[in-house]
């Protein structure tokens, strides 16, 4: 049976990948009186007096909405809300399997920025966090920024930040392998969409100053008159200080790091050969990378990562988002801020001991059960230290709870 046939059969047999199950039984009058009338009035009254108690008495404290408009779904593009639901269901399965979080898929029948923002704001009372998913750039930037300002729960566009966090964790370790200083490296990033912009911002936060971002028109620089948008304009102000113009082939020369979030075969072996010694290549285009790892290695690359599970160093968002939201929910965070993102980077990177670190093992595997608990612990701690936590908890308790909640063996 082909992958297509197997996938279709699995989805049809189960009528999707999710179901709703109660946490309590209702098998007699006493249980009915507690779950519904008259007993249900008691938590209602308590929540009315203190809205924070909604986290204690309802699913809000362990539930995240997975929201899309279906405009930028995986490698499929703008396929609309209905066709995006299987992906949102899949994301919800990962939330539950890796961190015990209830993920609720919501596919919106609008691509209007204001309507999306208004709808998500109206949903805020129900959810402990919002995971934005597969919303096209540059609209995704405004939607996330507005929602972060106008809501009081964590809003996280995983296509941006999940990718950036795992990429950064991999880069931290790859630089240890090649023994290069992050403040002195030259990075060329190909792809100026949601993931690329977020990666550049996180690289800057980690001290990388020599960066050139490319899109389909070549190097982005301040004052470029073509193919720009407000987000690219901002990035251009603090990247490519020398205003280098030209194609990817021209600007990748002497680079220490290539990061691709673009299209298959964008990077050639000759381009790799033109880079600095011991180059690091993260080729994350899906389903096919910018360069095949074996080809990159043959051209001189020292460390190669992709988005695929059939090659070493898989840069997979599942290493980040379950633990990030678990940590945020445990402290009832109001936001996911930069300190929490950095804490997630360090949690992922630190899981690989120096004695284990090598060219083919710079990033933990997606089924390493230590990942989500470690990320959750670090994120909860960072939330408390940075002032966005509503409650104080012991970070080690967060680790232990997440370890018990994960389905991984």
PLM feature spans:
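N-terminal ligand-binding/catalytic initiation module
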Residues: 1-153, 382, 389-390, 407-409
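Short, ordered loop/turn segments at secondary-structure junctions
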Residues: 69-71, 79, 108-109, 134-137, ...
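Glycine-rich phosphate/diphosphate-binding loop of Rossmann-like nucleotide-binding domains
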Residues: 74, 79-99, 157, 165-263
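A short, aliphatic-rich alpha-helical micro-motif
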Residues: 124, 182, 251-252, 272-275
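ADP-ribose/adenylate-binding Rossmann-like module
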Residues: 131-134, 155, 257-311
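Short, acidic/small-residue loops that bind anionic groups at enzyme active sites
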Residues: 150-164, 283-286
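Adenosine-phosphate binding glycine-rich loop
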Residues: 158, 180, 283-393
